């Protein structure tokens, strides 16, 4: 990844404002998509639970996707990005 910021003692400085704004926008889209996907997965898991399909491949795959998504969101939160 090409950095668009430089870290200094007082914080961060941008090297290319337009490129940084573009990347920030894409990052925000990613965060929105992750949060939306987590909600959709939770709804789908609940539907499968109600059908008694908690041992199905679909349920296990969705549960794994939810865990990965939650890990990513937790990591973003730990950096105060959400």
Description of each model-found segment:
Residues 2-82:
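Extended, charge-rich alpha-helical interface modules
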């Amino acid at each position: 990844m090409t950095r668009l910021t430089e870290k200094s003692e007082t914080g961060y400085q941008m090297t290319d404002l337009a490129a940084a704004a573009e990347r920030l926008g894409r990052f925000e889209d990613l965060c929105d998509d992750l949060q939306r996907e987590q909600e959709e997965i939770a709804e789908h898991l609940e539907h499968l639970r109600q059908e008694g399909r908690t041992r199905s491949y679909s349920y296990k795959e969705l549960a794994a996707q939810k865990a990965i998504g939650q890990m990513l969101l937790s990591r973003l939160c730990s950096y105060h990005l959400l």
